[in-house]
Amino acid sequence: MENMTVRNVSVVFPGRGPGQTVQALDDINLTIRSGDFVVALGASGCGKTTLLSLMAGFIAPSRGELLLGGEPIAGPGADRGVVFQKHALLPWLNVIDNAEFGLKLQGVPRAQRRDIAVRNLALVGLQDFHKHMIYQLSGGMQQRVGIARALTCDPAMLLMDEPMAALDALTRETIQELLLDVWKKTSKMFFFITHSVEEALFLASRLIVMSPRPGRITHTYDLDFNRRFLETRDARAIKSSPDFIAMRERVLNIIYGDEKMHAAGAGVAHV
């Protein structure tokens, strides 16, 4: 069983002026286990995307270490699939060629990679769209292709950076439910970033709330709304339940309180 371990991690970026620095993350400690769906929530600039970029191996920490399966993360790897806010698909390839592209780069034989891509496209409900070009798909369908592509290399972990931010409300809810189905069927580690409190509560088995810069994990909640959905298939009933509403208000109060404190410290007035 592979775990993602983030141990005493801080990140400092160069500032705008000579000798200036900006601390993006401060002393982050987090363990994500197989079968965890961890969602990071916080105000803009709290370091959520920086934390995901560290896990993906796109950047290195200024201090601390990140381990996957006990091995240090030294860069991007096939053991981590990434889904971005913008789908990053290749427009000159059709759906199935996009889905199998990572395996092609690894030199996997065509018949084998095609079989894997077919299975993963079926997992996200695109079994009838193999030959469609990307421009022929809706935004939600394009994100489904991105999810299928991330799954084809059988990563231990899926990293998702606000993948539904540009989708309409109905499509967003559909993709949320799809993600929970994929999570249930694969038991992979998920690390998901969002600005939506409702989305975070619905998806997360564990929610981490981060403070504004420097980003710190200030609150952690173990949740079961996702499992309740998988049992009942009634998202509306769950999102309108008293405990869901109470948790939403609790988290909103934390985030708004953090934003006000950060603005006051920066000398910004909120009207």
From Swiss-Prot:
Annotated residues for binding of ATP: 42-49
Lineage of the species this protein comes from: Bacteria, Pseudomonadati, Pseudomonadota, Betaproteobacteria, Burkholderiales
Assembly and interaction partners: The complex is composed of two ATP-binding proteins (TauB), two transmembrane proteins (TauC) and a solute-binding protein (TauA).
Localization: Cell inner membrane
Species annotation: Paraburkholderia xenovorans (strain LB400)
PANTHER family for this protein: TAURINE IMPORT ATP-BINDING PROTEIN TAUB, TAURINE IMPORT ATP-BINDING PROTEIN-RELATED
EC number assigned by the record: 7.6.2.7
Name this polypeptide is given: Taurine import ATP-binding protein TauB 2
UniProt catalytic activity: taurine(out) + ATP + H2O = taurine(in) + ADP + phosphate + H(+)
Membrane topology: Peripheral membrane protein
